[in-house]
């Protein structure tokens, strides 16, 4: 199997980053024709505010199709911490959380059957929610569709399509409107992988607190109707001013109850799917590799990074170095690697990372 590519951070580049995974042909070709109004790094959400998005259902639908072509960015994050009791200068004690290791591995490439073909090389599909799903449907609070456990409105005759939801959003007379679009990653057993990684860390005799998570970045988009109130709520300095003057105490309830929200459209990116095997049965096929295959590829590199107390991203170079004996590294690098491996043996023997 091909090793995953190196990834760079482009979020803060002065030159706009051109996504190599954005399609150049097909439904999403040419990219978005509008720029985001705001990018919130804290919540990893991109906000759009354009009058065409809340008045032209075809333009809104085309924009959602284009947004669906851009991939989410799933990660595996392995983090270990312990607490230490330290004595301060005033002779009092305090508990401090110490990070022993914090490593991330990007999984975006595993969404593609052929990463060189962004149009047809991935199993992605634009969906609308089902009638039984409890989401906001132009409402303030989540609800099921009318006739399926939800109250009010005309009973749904079938499940509304993406195009229908675009028409309903644009036709709504609500003064404040918001449509949430999500990119979801499916097709892997995350619970299985979490247990495998927890066991891997435990095998190093680590005695601290382990956290295994699978965050998905570049997954959330919010579209607001173009009006002065929404421009103000998305402007950072106004938000800060409202916090400092405590005006948010009055503004937050107003915005919450006045804003009608739609959480009815999402893009599904499948890492695996069931396909007929030609004998009348169904078999699971993976876009790139299975959870077990990925674990076998990365297990040694992850365990080595944990013992080295690494913090940061791992890439294909770590996979290659993990399979390289220390005596092959040569020179000073080989001496350092041998020393680190010796420390790892000691840690495994006596345990490490416990609270104190």
State each model region's role.
Residues 100-345, 351:
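Extended amphipathic alpha-helical regions
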Residues 350-356:
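Short amphipathic alpha-helical segments
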Residues 1-163, 167, 181, 356:
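Intrinsically disordered, low-complexity regulatory segments in eukaryotic proteins
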């Amino acid at each position: 199997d091909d090793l995953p590519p190196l990834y760079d951070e482009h979020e803060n580049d002065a030159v706009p980053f051109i996504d190599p995974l954005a399609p150049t042909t097909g439904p999403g070709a040419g990219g978005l024709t509008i720029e985001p109004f705001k990018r919130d790094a804290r919540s990893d959400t991109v906000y759009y505010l354009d009058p065409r998005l809340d008045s032209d259902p075809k333009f809104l639908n085309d924009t959602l199709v284009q947004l669906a072509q851009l991939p989410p960015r799933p990660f595996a994050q392995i983090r270990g911490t312990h607490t230490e009791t330290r004595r301060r200068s005033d002779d009092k004690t305090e508990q401090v959380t110490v990070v022993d290791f914090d490593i991330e591995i990007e999984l975006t490439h595993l969404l593609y059957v052929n990463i060189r073909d962004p149009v047809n090389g991935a199993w992605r599909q634009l969906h609308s929610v089902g009638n039984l799903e409890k989401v906001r449907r132009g409402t303030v609070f989540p609800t099921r569709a009318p006739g399926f456990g939800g109250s009010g409105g005309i009973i749904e005759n079938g499940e509304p399509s993406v195009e229908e939801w675009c028409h309903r959003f644009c036709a709504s007379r609500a003064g404040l409107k918001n449509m949430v679009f999500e990119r979801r990653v499916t097709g892997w057993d995350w619970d299985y992988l979490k247990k495998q990684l927890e066991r891997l860390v435990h095998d190093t005799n680590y005695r601290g607190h382990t956290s295994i998570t699978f965050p998905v970045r570049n997954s959330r988009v919010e579209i607001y109707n173009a009006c002065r109130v929404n421009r103000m709520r998305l402007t950072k300095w106004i938000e800060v001013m409202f916090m400092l003057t405590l005006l948010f105490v009055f503004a937050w309830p107003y915005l919450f109850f006045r804003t009608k929200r739609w959480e009815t459209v999402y893009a599904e990116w499948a890492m695996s799917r069931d396909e007929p095997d030609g004998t009348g049965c169904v078999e699971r096929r993976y876009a790139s590799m299975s959870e077990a295959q990925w674990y076998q590829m990365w297990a040694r590199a992850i365990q080595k990074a944990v013992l080295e107390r690494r913090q940061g991203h791992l890439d294909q170079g770590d996979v290659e170095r993990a399979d390289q004996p220390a005596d092959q590294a040569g020179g000073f690098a080989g001496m350092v690697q041998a020393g680190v491996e010796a420390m790892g043996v000691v840690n495994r023997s006596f345990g490490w990372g416990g609270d104190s």
